[in-house]
């Protein structure tokens, strides 16, 4: 009886030793596979800010839109109920008819402003009203550094930065720092631009696009190939961007004007996440 039990225990012990050897081997394999991941990537990480000024006025209507708007306005007038002012005008018309028929007490008319008097007053105020011009002084001068241009379009902030021996236009960007999120990097960009107290609303925590570029050959190495840039969108709420002593180093460009500044490959990636509704 003791012999079978001893053989069983001996088999269990051998099984544990084999399992231990397999576990040790797999641990060494895992440590060897994990070792390369601890080495530094040859690509730097950066966050970029796509800061947009939304439209301040609506776009002009096309002829088809004007025709449709007129049709809808006509339908609205025909199907709508009378307003308080219209009911008052109808009541005054009835009283005027009674007055002509000598069935109306004139004492009820004392110190009462008629609806027609109000309409005449409103008409005078309307004639004195002058709407603001759709075309600003910056539009006339084609001053793209001004935020007060193309009021019916989205405008995007571009800055001119020196990369190696080249001056390139791009969205504002800074290098990612260990310990911060990529959105935190984008928020840090806004903080550096906020000398003029700009406030903006970020649209989400995830990047809306990315771009990868290599450094110029003069500064490129095997351990430092280039930069991977992650874009974050934000809408400008208040403030303006002014660079003291750096005239011509920034522009507020519309979507159609981006091609005048950005490199083709960079522009292709930026246009993928831009919507101009």
UniProtKB/Swiss-Prot annotation:
GO molecular function: structural constituent of ribosome
Classification via Gene3D superfamilies: Nucleoside Triphosphate Pyrophosphohydrolase
Superkingdom of origin: Eukaryota
Any GO CC annotation of this UniProt entry: mitochondrial large ribosomal subunit
InterPro entries given in the database record: NUDIX_hydrolase-like_dom_sf, Ribosomal_mL46, Ribosomal_mL46_N, Ribosomal_mL46_NUDIX
Residues with N6-acetyllysine modification: 228
Keywords: Acetylation, Mitochondrion, Ribonucleoprotein, Ribosomal protein, Transit peptide
Compartment(s) where it occurs, according to its Swiss-Prot or TrEMBL record: Mitochondrion
Primary location: mitochondrion
Modified residues (N6-succinyllysine): 217, 246
Pfam families noted in UniProt: MRP-L46
Family: Belongs to the mitochondrion-specific ribosomal protein mL46 family.
Subunit and interaction comment: Component of the mitochondrial ribosome large subunit (39S) which comprises a 16S rRNA and about 50 distinct proteins.
The protein's name: Large ribosomal subunit protein mL46
Annotated organism of origin: Rattus norvegicus (Rat)
Phylogenetic classification of the source organism: Eukaryota, Metazoa, Chordata, Craniata, Vertebrata
């Amino acid at each position: 009886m003791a012999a079978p039990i001893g053989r069983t225990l001996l088999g269990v012990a051998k099984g544990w030793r084999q399992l231990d050897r397999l576990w040790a081997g797999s641990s060494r394999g895992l440590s060897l596979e994990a070792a390369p991941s601890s080495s530094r990537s040859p690509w730097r990480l950066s966050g970029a800010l796509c800061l947009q000024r939304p439209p301040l006025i609506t776009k002009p209507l096309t002829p088809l839109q004007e025709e449709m708007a007129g049709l809808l306005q006509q339908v609205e007038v025909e199907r709508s109920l009378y307003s308080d002012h219209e009911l008052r005008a109808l009541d005054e018309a009835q009283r005027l008819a009674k007055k002509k028929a000598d069935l109306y007490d004139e004492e009820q008319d004392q110190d009462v402003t008629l609806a027609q008097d109000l309409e005449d007053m409103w008409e005078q105020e309307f004639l004195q009203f002058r709407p603001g011009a759709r075309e600003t002084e910056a539009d006339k001068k084609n001053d793209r550094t001004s935020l007060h241009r193309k009021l019916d379009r989205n405008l995007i902030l571009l800055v001119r930065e020196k990369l190696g021996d080249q001056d390139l236009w791009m969205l504002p960007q800074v290098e990612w720092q260990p310990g911060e999120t990529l959105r935190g990097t984008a928020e840090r960009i806004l903080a550096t631009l906020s000398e003029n107290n700009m406030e903006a609303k970020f649209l989400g925590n995830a990047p809306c696009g990315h771009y990868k570029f290599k450094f110029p050959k003069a500064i490129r190495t095997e351990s430092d190939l280039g930069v991977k840039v992650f874009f974050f969108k934000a809408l400008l709420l208040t403030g303006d961007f002014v660079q003291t002593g750096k005239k011509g180093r920034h522009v507020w460009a519309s979507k159609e004007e981006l091609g005048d500044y950005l490199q083709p490959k960079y522009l292709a990636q930026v246009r993928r996440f831009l919507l101009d509704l």
